[in-house]
């Protein structure tokens, strides 16, 4: 019969722990190797796939450099713009060297808070070679503070911005005025002109009212009153004749 002493048991237990640790380390190493092999295979497959399909992908060509465009530019310009009855009318006369007879251009109007772009029609060629741009925009904001034209002398040139500050345009006797005109004058701080326009409108409406009253009185006295009197006389005559017959 074998007797297990305490020293023998501790020795046996020590060697069991060593064996278990060795086996666990080998299993971890094999698992790490298998995981690394899977990752390497996945990365190699992901690298190989695009190369196999690279023949079907067409890369864009590198853009060629533009030539010398320093000669294309806007040399001078004259602008005129105004607002009347809520309609913005603007015109620009542009001179310079352009690569095309109708260079690309667009317009912008707005104020300090917002801006709105609009299309500009084809320019008109003047006798001296200048280009004339004209535009007419209805129902614009009465508080607009600027309108500008952006012109590109060539396709690769920097833009040239031509500014213009519109002002309200009214005749010396403003008989026809819209609320937009009054709002525009108030926004421009032309208070004296604003009061003058209001006074003219007040006098105009008073004159129209008095004229209407006079026309109504004339019509009544000329046609309506004689017709009413004649009708009363006719009815009175017929009533008297009927009374005489009854008697």
Swiss-Prot record:
Glycosylation site list: 97, 158
Spans through the membrane: 193-213
One Gene Ontology cellular component: membrane
Similarity comment: Belongs to the cytomegalovirus US6 family.
Keywords of this entry: Disulfide bond, Glycoprotein, Host cytoplasm, Host cytoskeleton, Host endoplasmic reticulum, Host Golgi apparatus, Host membrane, Immunoglobulin domain, Membrane, Signal, Transmembrane, Transmembrane helix
Organism encoding this protein: Human cytomegalovirus (strain Merlin) (HHV-5)
Subcellular location: Host endoplasmic reticulum membrane; Host cytoplasm, Host cytoskeleton; Host Golgi apparatus membrane
Domain of life: Viruses
Pfam families reported in the protein's UniProt record: CMV_US
Chief subcellular location: host cell
Protein name listed in UniProt: Membrane glycoprotein US9
């Amino acid at each position: 019969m074998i007797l297990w002493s305490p020293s023998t048991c501790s020795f046996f237990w020590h060697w069991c722990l060593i064996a278990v640790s060795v086996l666990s380390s080998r299993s971890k190493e094999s698992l790490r190797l298998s995981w690394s092999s899977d990752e390497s295979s996945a990365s190699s497959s992901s690298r190989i796939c695009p190369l196999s399909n690279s023949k079907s992908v067409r890369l864009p060509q590198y853009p060629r450099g533009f030539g010398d465009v320093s000669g294309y530019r806007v040399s001078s310009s004259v602008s005129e713009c105004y607002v009347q009855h809520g309609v913005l009318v603007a015109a620009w006369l542009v001179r310079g060297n352009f690569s095309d007879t109708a260079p690309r251009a667009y317009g912008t109007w707005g104020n300090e808070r917002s801006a709105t772009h609009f299309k500009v029609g084809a320019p008109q060629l003047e006798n001296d070679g200048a280009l004339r741009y004209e535009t007419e925009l209805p129902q614009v904001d009465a508080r607009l503070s600027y309108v500008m034209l952006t012109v590109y002398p060539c396709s690769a040139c920097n833009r040239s911005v031509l500014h213009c500050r519109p002002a309200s345009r009214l005749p010396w006797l403003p008989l026809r005025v819209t609320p937009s005109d009054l709002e525009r004058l108030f926004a421009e701080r032309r208070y004296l002109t604003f009061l003058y326009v209001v006074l003219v409108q007040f006098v105009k409406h008073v004159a129209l009212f008095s004229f209407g009253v006079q026309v109504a009185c004339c019509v009544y006295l000329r046609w309506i009153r004689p017709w009413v009197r004649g009708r009363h006389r006719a009815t009175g005559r017929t009533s008297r004749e009927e009374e005489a017959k009854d008697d």
